[in-house]
C-alpha cells in the first residue's frame, strides 16, 4: 500500500496529470534547495516527500486561466 494513497491525493488536485507535474517540479526544487516542508517524512525520496506535502495541504496548485 502506498502512502499517501492516490485517492487522498486526487482529493487535493484535479487530475493525475496535475499531480505528477506538481510533485515532479517540487521534487526537483527539493533536490536543488534541500528544503522539505514536512518535518518527519516517511519517504526518503524527493517525489515521495513532495506527495506527502501535497497530501498534508502544504503544497497547492492554482490553474492558470487562459
From Swiss-Prot:
<keyword id="KW-0548">Nucleotidyltransferase</keyword>
<dbReference type="InterPro" id="IPR006110">
    <property type="entry name" value="Pol_omega/Rpo6/RPB6"/>
</dbReference>
<comment type="function">
    <text>Promotes RNA polymerase assembly. Latches the N- and C-terminal regions of the beta' subunit thereby facilitating its interaction with the beta and alpha subunits.</text>
</comment>
<comment type="similarity">
    <text>Belongs to the RNA polymerase subunit omega family.</text>
</comment>
<dbReference type="Pfam" id="PF01192">
    <property type="entry name" value="RNA_pol_Rpb6"/>
</dbReference>
<dbReference type="GO" id="GO:0006351">
    <property type="term" value="P:DNA-templated transcription"/>
</dbReference>
<dbReference type="InterPro" id="IPR003716">
    <property type="entry name" value="DNA-dir_RNA_pol_omega"/>
</dbReference>
<keyword id="KW-0240">DNA-directed RNA polymerase</keyword>
<dbReference type="InterPro" id="IPR036161">
    <property type="entry name" value="RPB6/omega-like_sf"/>
</dbReference>
<dbReference type="GO" id="GO:0003677">
    <property type="term" value="F:DNA binding"/>
</dbReference>
<protein>
    <recommendedName>
        <fullName>DNA-directed RNA polymerase subunit omega</fullName>
        <ecNumber>2.7.7.6</ecNumber>
    </recommendedName>
</protein>
<comment type="subunit">
    <text>The RNAP catalytic core consists of 2 alpha, 1 beta, 1 beta' and 1 omega subunit. When a sigma factor is associated with the core the holoenzyme is formed, which can initiate transcription.</text>
</comment>
<dbReference type="GO" id="GO:0000428">
    <property type="term" value="C:DNA-directed RNA polymerase complex"/>
</dbReference>
<keyword id="KW-0804">Transcription</keyword>
<dbReference type="GO" id="GO:0003899">
    <property type="term" value="F:DNA-directed RNA polymerase activity"/>
</dbReference>
<keyword id="KW-0808">Transferase</keyword>
Amino acid at each position: 500500500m502506498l502512502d499517501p494513497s492516490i485517492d487522498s491525493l486526487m482529493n487535493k488536485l484535479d487530475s493525475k496529470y496535475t499531480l505528477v507535474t506538481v510533485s515532479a517540479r517540487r521534487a526537483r526544487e527539493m533536490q536543488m534547495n534541500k528544503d522539505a516542508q514536512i518535518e518527519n517524512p516517511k519517504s526518503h525520496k524527493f517525489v515521495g516527500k513532495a506527495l506527502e506535502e501535497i497530501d498534508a495541504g502544504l503544497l497547492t496548485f492554482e490553474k492558470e486561466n487562459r
